């Protein structure tokens, strides 16, 4: 049954490609025009939400722990800080409108009112890029430098490393784990507990980072769009079989390297063209498999696009133009290497 759903989905994509600009479809799937794939994004959002909850809960456990009775001022400051984090969490991550449609952790988005989905779509990006999530990601970046020690609960970082301060939370340097751990007021049990809290804090922050890194799209949909568009174009451009075969066979690079592409996409400020640029670059750099004949066929395909746009008196999308120039430049480089 699942296979049949995928077949129908591909048939729908094939039909849609015939009637819509491929770059527009790409923008829609990647979500750069405000569209999001709820079946992908909602589970991702829930993972981020759970990990943020775990992070704040860990700090809350520390604040209420008996060990903090020995540090009254620190306890009060931590209590106020945790309250601020919970208030931010409530504001950013409460979406009861969608959650009430969940059945055993799954949502049939066809049954969710459009206005609810529209609201979530509008707020999604700002939520995962919120100050709260950014704080936790920065905390993760700091702690990741001590990954091996923390995961082994090795107190080396709190005892031997130079300096008097080990504060892993941005904007809250008062929470100094090195000071807490090395206090004469603590028993060995207290020290073990503090190290455990640091471990839980790091694993929760890692959970946020890993969830944030999940692509917002179905990579298979993107593959199908590329393959379907090639299928339509190849009928109109004769004697370019090898180049089209190269594109079709290389489409799996998209799946193989997509995590890297997606990281570049996020790092670029959500510029979807980055994904296509890196994908085309990977195809072009496979120089041992690109003969002068295939290079010529790639140029023919590019010329077809330019002629088609010129005939229709259209202005080429600057992003598409950049891709074309990039491919031409890479092909020139490959030609020089082979001569």
Curated annotation (Swiss-Prot):
Keyword annotations of the record: Host cytoplasm, Host nucleus, Host-virus interaction, Late protein, Virion
Cellular localization per UniProt: Host cytoplasm; Host nucleus; Virion
Gene Ontology CC entries for this record: host cell cytoplasm; host cell nucleus; virion component
Induction info: Expressed in the late phase of the viral replicative cycle.
Claim: Transferase is one of the keywords in the record: no
Domain of life: Viruses
Record note on quaternary structure: Interacts with NACA (alpha chain of nascent polypeptide-associated complex).
Record-stated family: Belongs to the asfivirus H339R family.
Protein name: Protein H339R
Organism name: African swine fever virus (isolate Pig/Kenya/KEN-50/1950)
């Amino acid at each position: 049954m699942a296979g049949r759903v995928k077949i129908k989905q591909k048939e729908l994509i094939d039909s849609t490609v015939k009637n819509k600009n491929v770059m527009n479809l790409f923008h829609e799937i990647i979500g750069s025009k405000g569209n999001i794939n709820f079946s992908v994004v909602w589970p991702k959002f829930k993972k981020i939400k759970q990990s943020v909850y775990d992070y704040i809960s860990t700090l809350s456990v520390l604040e209420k722990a008996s060990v903090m009775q020995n540090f009254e001022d620190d306890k009060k400051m931590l209590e106020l800080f945790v309250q601020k984090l919970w208030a931010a969490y409530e504001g950013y991550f409460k979406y009861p409108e969608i959650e009430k449609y969940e059945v055993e952790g799954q949502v049939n988005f066809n049954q969710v009112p459009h206005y609810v989905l529209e609201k979530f779509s509008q707020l999604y990006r700002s939520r995962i890029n919120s100050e709260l999530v950014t704080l936790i990601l920065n905390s993760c970046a700091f702690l990741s430098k001590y990954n091996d020690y923390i995961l082994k609960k090795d107190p080396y970082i709190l005892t031997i490393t130079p300096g008097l301060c080990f504060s892993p939370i941005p904007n809250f340097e008062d929470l100094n784990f090195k000071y807490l751990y090395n206090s004469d007021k603590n028993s060995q049990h207290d020290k073990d507990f503090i190290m455990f809290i640091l471990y839980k804090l790091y694993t929760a922050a890692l959970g946020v980072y890993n969830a944030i890194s999940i692509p917002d799209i179905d990579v298979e949909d993107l593959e199908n769009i590329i393959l379907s568009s090639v299928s339509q174009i190849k009928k109109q451009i004769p004697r370019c079989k090898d180049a089209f075969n190269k594109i079709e066979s290389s489409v799996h690079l998209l799946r193989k390297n997509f995590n890297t592409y997606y990281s570049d996409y996020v790092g670029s400020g959500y510029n979807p063209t980055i994904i296509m640029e890196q994908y085309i670059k990977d195809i072009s750099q496979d120089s041992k498999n690109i003969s002068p004949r295939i290079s010529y066929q790639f140029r023919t395909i590019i010329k077809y696009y330019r002629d088609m746009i010129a005939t229709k008196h259209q202005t080429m999308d600057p992003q598409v133009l950049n891709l074309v120039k990039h491919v031409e430049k890479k092909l020139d480089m490959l030609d020089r290497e082979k001569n």
